[in-house]
Each structure stands twice: as structure tokens, then as C-alpha cells.
């Protein structure tokens, strides 16, 4: 069973949550969802032109994890643009800088890592094992 992904540090929240082709109502378009941390990866690497290692450090993930996030984001954007779909930015596993952890629903101090690992749920087999 895969572990719950850790929060990715995000420094920027987009003011716009949806992009779509001009002239077509959103209700008639299929959407591609871009996670907030995927947009952050695109912003850091492609817009700010930082090195991947610096991007990974800012998002508090390993370089290979950053690479996977970036590749996934680029693929989604390419698919949406080439097939005329809307792009919706929402969701994901992220914390806002030294501010708020969306998943833990609490404030995070400067330099404090977000180590959210999900909520442990006891099953009946756990109770009988004790």
C-alpha cells in the first residue's frame, strides 16, 4: 500500500482558477485538472527559470519528486491545449509557504516542515491484534 504523499510547499496561489478556449462556454467543455503544486512546479521552473534542485528545495520535495510533478503538469497542460479543453487549477497536497497547511488545517511556522501523513484509522483487525 502506498503511503500518503507529503505536503508540497507552495508560495503562490493563482488568482484565476480556470482557463478555457475563447468563444466556447465552460459548460460545453471538458476540463483537465491541474493541482496547485503542479502549477507551482511550472511557475518555479518555466516562469522563474530556476534550476530543478532549487525548485525542489523551495517546494520541500526531493529532486526526483519535483521532476515527476513537473512532467505530470506539463503533460496535462499540453493535453488540454492540444485538445481544446479547459484547465482548472484546484486540489492537491500542498501547504502555503510559512502559512497554512490545507491538509492539517492549521498554521505552520517559518521553517517548520509539513509532515502530514494522513489520519490513522483503526480497523477491527487492529483492535483484535492487541
UniProtKB/Swiss-Prot annotation:
The entry sums up its family as follows:
Belongs to the UPF0251 family.
**Alphabetical list of Pfam families matching this protein:** DUF134 (PF02001)
Q: What is this protein called?
A: UPF0251 protein Swol_2090
Q: Which PANTHER family match?
A: PTHR37478, UPF0251 PROTEIN TK0562
